[in-house]
Every structure is written in structure tokens, then in C-alpha cells.
């Protein structure tokens, strides 16, 4: 199964990974995707799994199946009907990039096993969704309050600062911190325990209703997939396609999305948050989680944004920890060739003159295809050529 093969690297290291690493594995590193747990009681060799592999979402390499220590019945059980779920992919990148996926927040808290008993898209009591524009959060789940203080931020696709890393002060919250764009997010209402048996975990199937994030919303009308699946085993791309096929459309159209991308690339300044984020917190989070949020502060100064980021980088330098350089495409190409039995890529580097400067041209050969790139150094040219080849052959 292709979705299992894509997660081979994670599944091989599963027994040696910490709980925090297992949670981060649910957020693909190189591009947005959807990581689904492989339950111990699940059937991942049957016809239902084969149908998933034949879909467009699977062929686009956005569906991953990773190992799990749980049975499907061990998952956190939300209400029988009426709980919400995002229909967006997940992404682990923390650098500046235009992305509408859900992102994890790196923090100093220790993870517990129970925090893995949910999907990142589900409004569970184990997940705390933080919209862009928020700087700090105060939570009171017990006697002592807890402050979530953002220490690093990036530019969201709506130009507001969004939290990337945070420090937990006070009582540990033991919740998964996840961020989303408050200007463009899509949710559905999930009704579990409907008639029918899931083709993977044998649980009851689920139906879905449209929320206010959709146009032509039909309150109370339930829609179900032709493929019998529960919400735990259903890729979010299937739910999105289901809603689109029933006449629903997101408020942010594809054309508007591309216009926002061009604006994001053109505008260097950040947008100050001037809207009330209380409604977004209420819509995204579980009812009990929302009630525990007593106070939040949003960015009202770009100077504070730059100061927080510069302080975060300065601390990393003092601790001799380099920032995330991004994916190593040379290594990824080698892994791709070993995984599928192809001859490893070869590189040819020559010295050239480009724009009056001494440069290097690297040619990458892989699978009867070649890519060329020019860079100021041999290393830079080789990485750029490998990146072009990886995006051409592996995506």
C-alpha cells in the first residue's frame, strides 16, 4: 500500500520514538498532508484500503498511514453528534511559507500517551487550537493558571503573526497546541455512530454536516461517503470532496486563495490583528477547552513581533543550535532511489561565469531526467539541482 510505504521511515523508527516525536510525525515535514493512525485492530490489506490508494489524494502523495499503539476503541470519544473537525491537511514546517494547513506549536512541555489518542484535525479535549494573531494565552483548568507565551512567530497567509514556538508557564496543560489561519479555515460537524461498519476498524460509520465556513450551507443535513469509513480512518480530502460534490464551496475560493498568495509574496510588512478572535477560538476548540481559556492577548505592535523572533534566534545561537535549514533534497533523492530500487542520482559540476561572476553549474541525472542549476558554490548548486529533481520526480 502506497500510503504505508510513504511512512516507512517513521514506521521503522516507531519503537524508538518518544511520545512528542510520535505526535510531530502526524505533521508531514516536506509538504502538507494527512497522517492517519494504523490501529492494531484495523484491516489495512482489504478492499477499502485499496480504494483509498486509488484516489487522487493518495496519488498526490498526501495520505500517510503510520503505526499506532492503540485500538480504534482507545481513541478519545467525542460526543455522539455535533463535534467539529477541520478538513485541512497538516504541516510541520516552521519557516516562512504560504500555507493554509494546521501547524504544531513547539513547546517545553512533556507529552503524555493520552495526547496521541486523537487526530490533529478533531476538536478534542486533547487539542488546543490557536488562531493566528494571538500572542499569549491564559488557561485555568485547575486551581493554578497556565500561561502559553509565544516565543517565535511566522507570517501567516493572511499576513498576521502566527505562533510557532511557545513557553508554558505554570501548570502543564497536557494539550496538543495547534495553530490555524483565522481568515481561511474549513470545518464540518461530525456525527459518529451511524449505521454501517467501517471497512478498516469495523467501528460505526460517520456522517458530516456543513458549518458556517461553507457557502450554500444546509443546516442539519447529513452527508455520507460512498466508501464506508469512520471519521478516524477517513482522509480529510475525502470529506472536503464530499462537501464540494454536494454543492458546498469554501468562502475563500481558489481564485481568492491565489490572490492572497501573490499578496503574501509581495507584502513584506505584517498585519496587525484588529478583529475579535473569541469566535474563532469557540468555533475551533472543544467546548471544555474553550471554557478553560480565560484570557488572550493579540499582537498590536510589529516591533514586538520582530523582537520576539530576534530573541528566539539569539537564544538558539547561544545554545549552539542552528535553525531549521529545511529538507535535505540530496538525502531525500537517495532515499527515494533506495526505496523504489532505482539507480542513485549522479551529479556533474562545472565552473561557469554567470552575470559576470564566477559560479558553478550542477547537472543532476536521475531516472532518464536531468535538471540544471547555477549557484555561488558547488554545494549550493548541487542542492538546488537535487531540489528541482525531487519536486519533478517525487511529487
Swiss-Prot record:
- Molecular function terms, GO-annotated: RNA binding
* Pfam families listed in its UniProt record: dsrm
InterPro entries xrefs: dsRBD_dom
Q: Which CDD domains match?
A: DSRM_SF
Q: Which Gene3D superfamilies match?
A: 3.30.160.20
Motif stretch (Putative autoproteolytic cleavage motif): 320-327
Q: Which UniProt keywords apply?
A: RNA-binding
Q: Where is the DRBM domain?
A: 328-395
User: By its UniProt entry, which SUPFAM superfamilies does this protein fall under?
Assistant: dsRNA-binding domain-like
Q: Which domain of life is it from?
A: Viruses
Name this polypeptide is given = Non-structural protein 1
Task: Tell me which species this is from.
Answer: Rotavirus X (isolate RVX/Human/Bangladesh/NADRV-B219/2002/GXP[X])
Q: What is the lineage of its organism?
A: Viruses, Riboviria, Orthornavirae, Duplornaviricota, Resentoviricetes
Amino acid at each position: 500500500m502506497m500510503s504505508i510505504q510513504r511512512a516507512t521511515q517513521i514506521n521503522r523508527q516507531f519503537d524508538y520514538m518518544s511520545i512528542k516525536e510520535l505526535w510531530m510525525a502526524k505533521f508531514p515535514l516536506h509538504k502538507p498532508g494527512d497522517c492517519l493512525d494504523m490501529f492494531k485492530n484495523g484491516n489495512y490489506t482489504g478492499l477499502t484500503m485499496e480504494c483509498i490508494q486509488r484516489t487522487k489524494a493518495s496519488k498526490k502523495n498526501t495520505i500517510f498511514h503510520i503505526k499506532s499503539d492503540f485500538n480504534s476503541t482507545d481513541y478519545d470519544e467525542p460526543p455522539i453528534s455535533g463535534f467539529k473537525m477541520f478538513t485541512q491537511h497538516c504541516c510541520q514546517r516552521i519557516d516562512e511559507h504560504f500555507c493554509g494547513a494546521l501547524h504544531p506549536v513547539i513547546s517545553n512541555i512533556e507529552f503524555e500517551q493520552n495526547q496521541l489518542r486523537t487526530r490533529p484535525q478533531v476538536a478534542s479535549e486533547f487539542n488546543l487550537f490557536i488562531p493566528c494573531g494571538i500572542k499569549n494565552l491564559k488557561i485555568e483548568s485547575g486551581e493554578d493558571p497556565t500561561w502559553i507565551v509565544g516565543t517565535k512567530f511566522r507570517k501567516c497567509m493572511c499576513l498576521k503573526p502566527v505562533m510557532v514556538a511557545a513557553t508554558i508557564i505554570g501548570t502543564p496543560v497536557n494539550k496538543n497546541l495547534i495553530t490555524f489561519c483565522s481568515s481561511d479555515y474549513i470545518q464540518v460537524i461530525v456525527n459518529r455512530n451511524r449505521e454501517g461498519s467501517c471497512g478498516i476498524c469495523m467501528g460505526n460509520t460517520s456522517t458530516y454536516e456543513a458549518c458556517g465556513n461553507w457557502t450554500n450551507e444546509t443546516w442539519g443535513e447529513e452527508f455520507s461517503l460512498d466508501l464506508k469509513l469512520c471519521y478516524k480512518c477517513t482522509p480529510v480530502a475525502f470529506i472536503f470532496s464530499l462537501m464540494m460534490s454536494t454543492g458546498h464551496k469554501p468562502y475563500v475560493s481558489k481564485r481568492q486563495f491565489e490572490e492572497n498568495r501573490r499578496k503574501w509574496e509581495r507584502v513584506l510588512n505584517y498585519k496587525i490583528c484588529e478583529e475579535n478572535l473569541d469566535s474563532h477560538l469557540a468555533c475551533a476548540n472543544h467546548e471544555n477547552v474553550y471554557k478553560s481559556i480565560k484570557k488572550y492577548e493579540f499582537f498590536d505592535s510589529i516591533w514586538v513581533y520582530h523582537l520576539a523572533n530576534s530573541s528566539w534566534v539569539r537564544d538558539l545561537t547561544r545554545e549552539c543550535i542552528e535553525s531549521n535549514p529545511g529538507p535535505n533534497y540530496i538525502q531525500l533523492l537517495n532515499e527515494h532511489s533506495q526505496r523504489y530500487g532505482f539507480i542513485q542520482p549522479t551529479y556533474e559540476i562545472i565552473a561557469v561565469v554567470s552575470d559576470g561572476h564566477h559560479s558553478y553549474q550542477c547537472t543532476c541525472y536521475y531516472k532518464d531526467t536531468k535538471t540544471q542549476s547555477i549557484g555561488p558554490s558547488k554545494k549550493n548548486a548541487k542542492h538546488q539541482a537535487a531540489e528541482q529533481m525531487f519536486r519533478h520526480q517525487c511529487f
